[in-house]
Regions:
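Phosphate- and other anionic-substrate recognition elements at nucleic-acid/protein interfaces
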Residues: 1-82
């Protein structure tokens, strides 16, 4: 397992047809912030755009028909996806 950068942002995504619930654990936090966004490309880009460097984002998502396109989008933006 690779050693994580101290500024790594952990992002957990619960994907639904019309929405995504995002759990965001920023460096130094013990409890993630949770928010709900629309399940569209613009909303995902806006979410990832809030972070200083998408390469520091480590995302996990719910695999399935609603998650695969999301995973491809996140990878194209530079995020690590599991």
């Amino acid at each position: 397992m690779p050693i994580l950068h101290p500024d790594t942002i952990h992002l957990g995504l619960d994907v639904h047809k019309d929405s995504i619930s995002a759990g965001i654990l920023n460096p130094g936090q013990e409890t993630p912030d949770v928010e709900k966004i629309f399940h569209d490309e613009e909303s995902v880009r806006r979410l990832i755009g809030r972070f200083p460097d998408p390469r520091l984002v480590r995302a996990c998502y719910e695999a399935g028909p609603t998650g695969y396109d999301l995973a491809r989008l996140l990878v194209s933006m530079g995020c690590a996806v599991r």
